[in-house]
Amino acid sequence: MPIEQCDKGFYKCYRTQLLPSKPKLTVPPVSFDKLSEKQKLVVRLVDNHLKGVGNQKNEQLQVLALGCAGAGKSAALLWVKKLLEEKQQQDENFAFKAVSLTGMAAFNVNGETIHSAFHINPYAKTQKQRMDSVIQAARNPDICKYFEKVKFLLIDEISTCGLAMLSFINKFLQLTHPGNDDKPFGGISFCFFGDPYQIRGIADYSAWEPLCMFLREKYGGIQDHYFGIPNCLFLDVSFRQSNETNSSSWYFGFLNRMRNLELTVDDIDKIRARMSCNLSAEELEQFEDCLHIFPLKLLVQQRNR
């Protein structure tokens, strides 16, 4: 019996959840006109590259967009992702990867975690074991065939990627793009977004460590590639505060003062006032459904019961 003749409720579920559908394009939170000049510059660099403006179609585009909280990194990233999605729909031989280290950050850009995208074994106990898992995956014929189409890499929260993580990505892309194994990230174009003041790679050397022979030899010169990115832009215009509430404006200002070691007595007093021991029972109830972060899986399981 044709599935269309089955229960209508089941068929609707089948159509909406089981059958493949055309992916929806990313919708940036603001129009292009409302972006700052540096945000527009990031987007135009990618747009011109994808269109081959200035005979740059076959050149490797390398962009590093840095900025503090509220500078509009996410808005610029989503505009870039929209351009990449449009290119992917128009060209069957073009694909891209949008990734981030943490699951939450990857979810926010509708992408993948770095471990998933580049087949890095998260349970490996040593960096050598992780690199071995990367090399093994990169030699898989099916994986290599897919990555032949991957021409662009988009990474959010680049500050969380230390030298080891960057070397895993670099090695994977070099192996899956034969002929470009001497080029950074296999010769594919990339655009990285992040804040160098934010959390650094866990159990890893920061990409911003001073250059030295030890790190160069240990991580295959990936730090030289990183410091050699030609298009490095700092988004320094406050983007969120123009349309946020007063409390949100203070919060983003607080984050920036904290990153610059410029906290005031008023900042510290406000933060102390929000400690759980200083909140009323009604205020504490408002946080019952908020995101809770715990250091141990056991505590997570206890919370979720």
Name every feature range the model reports, one short phrase each:
Residues 1-305:
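Conserved ATP-binding/catalytic motifs of P-loop helicase motor domains
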